[in-house]
Structures are given as structure tokens and as C-alpha cells.
Amino acid sequence: MSEEQLKAFIAKVQADTSLQEQLKAEGADVVAIAKAAGFTITTEDLNSHRQNLTDDELEGVAGGTASGGCDTSMFCY
């Protein structure tokens, strides 16, 4: 299971503005970006993580609380 890899990648993204910029690019391939950064995650891992977002995380992604950046759901805004 790649859950640990996904969590590690999310932590890396939160600390690395270069990765954040890559993920913000239109059509960004999150799986490929993660692989290039040394992580093994799948599209299924991402989809599963997105389905398990809390209401607060969803509100943040929708622009309700955050002012910009990448959050733990792998959405950049």
C-alpha cells in the first residue's frame, strides 16, 4: 500500500515550494511529479485520499479558508 508514500509526499510538498509550483501547473501529473521526487504513489491512492477529505479540507480547497498553496489533499489553489 502506498498510503505511507502518499503521506510522505504530501509532507514533502508542504515544505517544498518548487514541488508546489509544479503541482499548480495546468495538467500537472501528480503521480509523475511524485515519482520524480522519489515517491511511489498511484492514481488510485490519490483518488482514495480525495474521497476521504474532511468537510474542513473540502472547504479549504474550495477557497473557504485558505489563501493559496497546496494542502494535504494534493489540491493546489
Curated annotation (Swiss-Prot):
The modification 2,3-didehydrobutyrine is found at T65. Its main location: secreted. This is Lantipeptide prochlorosin 4.3. The gene is ProcA4.3. Keywords: Secreted, Thioether bond. There is a cross-link at T72-C76 (Beta-methyllanthionine (Thr-Cys)). Lanthionine-containing peptide (lantipeptide) with unknown function. Does not show antibiotic activity against Lactococcus lactis 117 and Bacillus subtilis 6633 bacteria. Organisms that produce this peptide live in oligotrophic environments at very dilute concentrations, suggesting this peptide is not secreted to influence other bacteria. There is a cross-link at S67-C70 (Lanthionine (Ser-Cys)). Induction: Down-regulated under nitrogen starvation. It comes from the Bacteria. Signal peptide: none annotated. It is found in: Secreted. Residues 1-64 form a propeptide. The keyword Membrane does not apply. It holds the Pfam family Nif11. Cross-links are proved in vitro, when coepressed in E.coli with the ProcM lanthionine synthetase. One of its GO terms (cellular component) is extracellular region.
